[in-house]
Amino acid sequence: MTLSTEMSDASGLAEETDIDVVGEGEDDEEEEDDDDEGGGGRGGGGSRLPSSAQRRRRSYAGEDDLEDLEEEDDDDLLLASRPAASPAPPGPAPAPGTGSGGCSGAGAGGGAGGGTGAGTGGGAKNPLVKPPYSYIALITMAILQSPKKRLTLSEICEFISSRFPYYREKFPAWQNSIRHNLSLNDCFVKIPREPGNPGKGNYWTLDPESADMFDNGSFLRRRKRFKRQPLLAPHAAAEALLLRGAGPAAGAGDPGAALFPPPPPPPACGYGAYGCAYGLQLPPCAPPSALFAAAAAAAAAAFHPHSPPPPPPPPPPPPGAAAELARTAFGYRSHALAAALPGPLQAAAVKAGGPGAAALARSPFSIESLIGRTRGPAAAGAHVSSGAASGTAPGPGGGGCAVQAAAGPAVALTRSLVVAAAAAASSVSSSAALGTLHQGTALSSVENFTARISNC
């Protein structure tokens, strides 16, 4: 009884033990599955191997299952470690015991290698470095190296591209900058292309006065901005020509003579401002200095820029006008005096005839009337006969006027003529000023004049 009871108890314990072992195995499988899922969720960090405590509690019945699971876990670990170690440099595979530590070391090594490579690539020097020269310096270099010291825009760009790789790579962008610097800086002068020289574009050269534009001949620094001096004013150019003694011979080889011709000669009349009709025909005055003439022309143009040109001077009078004007003392003829007289007076004077009519016919202030050279032969004979009669008649003083005439006939005649002319001038001028002339005024003055001559 006792033996059977013990056997039954032993068999019960064995069954319980088997059940417990099977239960533990299932629990272990569940824990291993959880570990596998946790390792897969960590992205290849490696699954944990079952600990030794769990192995001790397992029974012999579940050892085969555990070995299969361990092999599967090893395969999963290898597969997970290969993608993580792929960016690392080739080397020995990490040991199974290293786990996630080997993967982290490989990742750190790969990161360090990548950082070193990036630093090496960024430290390399770029060959396309912009030259330290301005556009004016580049243009000056191109012009100075040319044989004729002149280049077109395309030739300047070609020189810069061949000399500097930076501008060769960026050619279309800076060509307009070269064109603008050529046009806006006074140190560059544009030269038109010759008619027989085919091609496109004008030539560009350096102004001769811009030689000291750069400091000590270095193109890195410009001393000052060059300003072209303005052209000489007309009066300054005329003064320069006068100082150099520019004449017909000198002006033939002087280019300035063509730019600034001498001023035109002044008019031949002495009274140019009022015209030649208001004065005598005098010899032309000396021409003014070219300096003053040019200055006067420039001042007139400055004050009256839109004024019309002055009218041409009137033509000079004929050569006989001076003699005619000198013959008539005050510039009017005898017909002017006759026209000033009323009609009845003119008719009476003509009908009366005699010396009064002759005196009225000619001007009383002419040289001929004063000297008496133009009298007719009848008047001259009457004057001689009256003089002879008066000379033969005895006077109260014994000799009378005959002695006086013999002593100084010319002086007496001159005095009488001057007195008569003065009296006639006063009477005629007053009458002409009043616009009226009484009948017989001119005739009475002439009769008094002839009576004085006859009395002498």
Swiss-Prot record:
Q: Name one GO cellular component term.
A: nucleus
Q: What's any GO biological process attached to this entry?
A: canonical Wnt signaling pathway
Protein origin, superkingdom? Eukaryota
- Where is the segment annotated Disordered? 1-104, 303-322, 381-401
Keywords on record: Developmental protein, DNA-binding, Nucleus, Transcription, Transcription regulation
Q: Where is the composition biased (Low complexity)?
A: 381-393
Show which residues constitute the signal peptide: none
* Subcellular localization: Nucleus
SUPFAM superfamilies to which the protein is assigned, alphabetical: Winged helix' DNA-binding domain (SSF46785)
Annotated SMART domains: FH
Main localization (coarse): nucleus
Record InterPro entries:
Fork_head_dom, FOX_domain-containing, TF_fork_head_CS_1, TF_fork_head_CS_2, WH-like_DNA-bd_sf, WH_DNA-bd_sf
Could you tell me one molecular function GO term of this UniProt entry?
A: RNA polymerase II cis-regulatory region sequence-specific DNA binding
Tissue specificity statement from the Swiss-Prot or TrEMBL entry: Predominantly expressed in the CNS and temporal half of the retina. Also expressed in the condensed head mesenchyme, metanephric blastema of the developing kidney, cortex of the adrenal gland, condensed mesenchyme at the base of the follicles of vibrassae and cartilage perichondrium of the developing vertebrate.
Q: Where is the composition biased (Acidic residues)?
A: 15-38, 62-77
**Compositionally biased, Pro residues: which spans?**
86-95, 306-320
Q: Which residues bind DNA?
A: 130-224
Observed phenotype of the null mutant = Mice show disrupted cell identity in the ventrotemporal area of the retina and aberrant morphogenesis of the optic chiasm. Their kidneys remain fused, have a disorganised ureteric tree and fail to ascend to a lumbar position.
Q: What does this protein do?
A: Transcription factor involved in regulation of gene expression in a variety of processes including formation of positional identity in the developing retina, regionalization of the optic chiasm, morphogenesis of the kidney, and neuralization of ectodermal cells. Involved in transcriptional activation of PGF and C3 genes.
Protein name, UniProt field: Forkhead box protein D1
Name the source organism. Mus musculus (Mouse)
